[in-house]
Amino acid sequence: MDCGKSTLALQMDHNHRARGRGGVRFSRNDRAGKSRISSRLGLQTDAVEVGDGTDFWEEVMRRRTQGQRVDYLICDEAQFYSPEQVEQLAKVVDEIDVDVFAFGITADFRTRLFPGSQRLIELADRVQVLQVEALCWCGRRATHNARTVDGVMVTEGAQVVVGDVDMAMDPAATVESGHIPVVGYETLCRRHFMRRVTAHGANLMAEQDQLLPFEVDACLWHGTGGTGAGTSAEAGA
C-alpha cells in the first residue's frame, strides 16, 4: 500500500496500448468498487472483476475466439487471486505467449503471505520491488501493512477486509450497541509495526508527554533507538 502499484499498473497499460497492443485489465476488491482499477492519485479505469470462479485461461481463449486481440494482461490486486488462478496466468504466458503483468502486495496485516502472492513469487519470471517507497509516520521506509479498528492496531481478524484510509467493516468483528467498527490500513516500518505504534498512537503519546512533569524516552514512539537490550543479529531497515 502507498507504493504506487495501481498507478504503475495503469501506466503500464497506457504504454502498451499506445504501441498498438491489445490487452485486458483485471482487478479484485479495488477500493473504488468492483470492476475498477484506481490509484490514490485519482486515476482510475474500468477492469474485469476477478471472482472465485474466474479462469484466466478460459477468459483469454474466449476473447481470442471472438476476435479480440489479447497481447497482454494487467492484473491488479493480485494478492487476492487464488494459487490456481496464478497458475492459469503462468499457463497463458507459456502456452500462448501473452504477457502478464501482476501487481500486488505480498503480506497481510499479520505479516503472513497472501496465498496468491506466494504462488506468484514461486512462478514469476521476474519479481520487482517498486521504486516508490511507502513511508512510515516516522519517516522510515514502510515495510508492513497494519490494520486498525477504530484507530487501534489489530493483528487478528479476517485476512481480506477491503479498505484504505476510508472506513470498512470487518466481517469478523462484532457489532455492539449499533456501533460499526471503522477499519483502516496504515503502512509502518518494522520497528513500529512490532511495537504496534501507529501515527494516531504516536500523536496520543506525544500529547501525553507534554502533560507529564518529566521527560519520557521518546524512542518508544519516535524511533530513535532501542531500550538497551543488545543483540548480535542485524536486520536492514
Describe the residue ranges of each PLM region.
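Sensor-1/coupling segment of RecA-like P-loop NTPase cores
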Residues: 93-116
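Short basic (Lys/Arg) and small-residue
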Residues: 124
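A short acidic, amphipathic alpha-helical/loop segment
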Residues: 12, 84-92, 116
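Walker B beta-strand of ABC/ABC-like P-loop ATPase nucleotide-binding domains
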Residues: 73-74
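Short recognition patches in nucleic-acid-associated and regulatory proteins
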Residues: 133-177
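Residues immediately C-terminal
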Residues: 80-81
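Walker B catalytic acidic pair
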Residues: 77
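Conserved P-loop
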Residues: 1-64, 108-119, 132, 168-175, ...
